């Protein structure tokens, strides 16, 4: 079993990749993009998981019992408020923690793979972005409409090219 902490764009990309290439039972902890995630989205996690991919700034991965013995944590987000932990459960359970980074040898290859997956339709991002805005003439509308979202509006983006 696998848990993704965070329900934004990066979580959606990770989920789409895993769903296309692996057979995991996936739960997603988050509050955003409810229409997109459907029943995968959870308000809390009450199980343990073989793999936890943490893409959020909160500290659940360190404060809750989420990872099985010899499990894996992929820590993909800085903890903006800091964390307080003694790591005793992670140490006792021989949990592996990895930190993805642009300095990691496979990072560029992963980004190239994501581009190909989007181009071929293997990674479906159509439901994630609702509207594009011209950066010269509509940038203020992008922020306004994002703050006061109409039904069906998920996310907007500003076109830079």
Give the predicted meaning of each segment.
Residues 3, 7, 13, 108-161:
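C-terminal hydrophobic helical "lid"/dimerization subdomain
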Residues 44-52:
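A short acidic, Gly/Pro-enriched loop at the edge of an enzyme's catalytic core
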Residues 22-25, 48, 69, 124, ...:
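Short loop/turn motifs at secondary-structure junctions
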